[in-house]
Amino acid sequence: MRLIIKGAVALFLLLAISIPLSAQYIVQGVVTDSLTREPLSYVSVRLKNTTEGTTTGSDGRFYFKTHRSEGVLVISTVGYNEYSRLIHPARNLSYKVALSPATYALNEVLVKPKREHYRKKDNPAVEFVRRMIEHRDDHSPNEKDFWQRDRYEKTTFALNNFDEEKQKKWLYRKFDFLTEYVDTSAVTGKPILTVSARELLATDYYRKSPHSEKQWVKGRKQAGVDEFLSKQGMQAAINEVFKDVDIYENNISLFTNKFVSPLSRIGTGFYKYYLMDTLQIGGETCADLAFTPFNSESFGFNGHLYVTLDSTYFVKRAVLNFPKKINLNFVDYMLLEQEFKRAEDGTRLLDHESITVEFKLTEGQDGIFARRVADYSCYSFLPTEEADKAFTKPERIIEETEALSRPETFWAENRPQAAISQQENSVDRLMAQLRGYPVYYWTEKVLSILFTGYIPTSKEAPLFYIGPMNATISGNTLEGPRIRAGGMTTAWLNPHLFGKGYIAYGFKDERLKGLAEVEYSFKKKKEYANEFPIHSLKVRYESDVNQYGQNYLYTSKDNVFLALKREKDDRIGYYRQTEMTYTNEFYSGFSFQLTARRRTDESSYLIPFLRKDGEAYSPVKDFSTSAAELKLRYAPNEKFFQTQWNRFPVSLDAPVFTLSHTIAGKGVLGSDYTYNHTEAGIQKRFWFSAFGYTDIILKAGKVWDKVPFPLLIMPNANLSYTIQPESYSLMNAMEFMNDEYFSWDVTYFLNGGVVQSYPIVEKTEMEGNSFLSWTLWAFE
């Protein structure tokens, strides 16, 4: 889910928010063709060894801000000679630059690329790319029956541009030892302070038929300011943001979006290609193939592919970055680099990959520097016993028991030489020193409560969590002010047996409510009861208020932020419920749930129950149902952010199919009514490459018997001022009740394809990820 990714990024950005802005200067001017004197659009203008810069507009003009009083201005574009000069932005000058066209020779073909007159017809670069696309699978390792490789991966987050001037700011003066941990980025050359580091050592396995991909994790290490967050949840979110990249696919997944690959089947209609020059890489002569999207706001890349000049069209190196005008939330800069080598039989092997990102929350802040580096080695195409063992496991990622507790000697022996950085590998020491200061210690505690909602009873391996804290104080029309206290046990108390509960009290109705739950897990858990996969038996008793027509998917009804309503909430009664549930989840994505439930719905002065006897109505205090329920769910390749109490999807690419049926018989175990209720649903995200994506949710349901209104189907109304998925913000609670329905929710995200074309969006830097949404609830 995109809100989860943004929240994780915002955690790191919070560290940089309070840094005062330094003096800023303006760099502006115009770029023209030296021969025609026509303005040149989409020209790269930047300060050397920094990410500060911009691209020229349609009139050739450029404008950007910098806090540097001196620097080297570099202006470059495809088909022209690069221009550079020393400038002093503090002097507030306007620069007029005329670029001279460049001429390149390649295979005795003369290419003079001119951006203003780009043509696909009879273009040697386009023909070159078409031949590359035709042969892109010829030497793919996935054409082999089997392969395996060792992987070392390191992901770091750092405060960006942590220079001497920033170190003097009041926020950091208390922590003068931070200078000991300042490093220099090998990509941007900026001083950075690493505040989070993650390392992974694993072996990847691939089998063509039957198709299977596994990863055997031998070591995993984490240290930094994000330690208080769910380890599994953060790892899932980071894996979704920094996915493995295959430039030979039609689409490249990064930052929960999909971008058109330069080697996509539709590449020649999406990109402009240029043959720039020839050069030697690893002893082989390669062509420098440059590319840029026709539309600089579209979800694609600028970059270079270095391709061997032989019949294999082998890519030795790839360099990709985002167009400057792309609007991608907090992402201000991105650089993706890949290096390939050949096996003895010519198979293409990925040797090294790095993704460098600069995140910014607001202009004027240096933000966060993030980098993921992966080194691959020890490729083999012969199956091994270890591989056979991995393929017998149901899970895709197999983690060794001691993977999280490897000693430092293990990492020192297994880190590649290029990954050895004293500052990056000293985050443990940095965090220990920071926590020695009360101001940081308590700030971290507060952030932990805000992000997780729970208070652990101990720093290491807590036996019990108190919370959720956002439900401690709330209120509604029936109860008036309401207080609640609760918590849950963890796997550190018992890895199989878990308890959860709360007690709540309303000062207006003066009634005590509560929940008591005991769950036995047949699988040993690491931290929480709801870790995937769940295989458990749970007994639960709950007595509380029932807010009819308000059932939220990802938050508690007691959330304090839901207490403020746009409409008077006077559709509230009471209920008591006892249930026993058996749940079994499988790695295939299939799960089922069997529940036996006894429920009593009780009226209140806000929701009276009346029974019609002839022409007269008599009040009914309550009614009961004894029901059995079966739920089936299938969500292959589903990925989610795991928290202490819930799961939030981090990707909607996987389809989700659901089917459930509830049955109750009048007179059976004291049930007052016969009740049959069937629900079915499907949801899926569909990607249209360069044309965005659409999210589709289809649901249908039917109550097959004549029942009182609390047992009917009520559309989910959202009376709060928050955004809640699959709820109706313009509908009131119990405004509609029905015994059958069909609903569809379709949202089409254009990825800036239309809205960002308007000048007002470009000039105001508004969010350009336009979308269209349709929602329908058909009922009877």
Positions of predicted regions on the chain:
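Short, ordered, surface-exposed loop/turn motifs in non-cytosolic proteins
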Residues: 25-27, 34-49, 68
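Hydrophobic beta-strand segments
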Residues: 43-47, 73, 111, 320, ...
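Extracellular beta-sheet/turn segments enriched in Thr/Pro/Gly and aliphatic residues
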Residues: 88-114
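Short, acidic Ser/Thr/Gly-rich low-complexity loop/linker segments typical of extracellular
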Residues: 51-61
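A short, solvent-exposed loop/turn motif at the edges and junctions
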Residues: 47-49, 72-85
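A short, amphipathic beta-strand motif
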Residues: 27-33, 60, 97
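Exposed, low-structure sequence patches enriched in small/polar residues
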Residues: 257-259, 391-780
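Structured extracytoplasmic
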Residues: 104, 110, 114-286, 292-300, ...
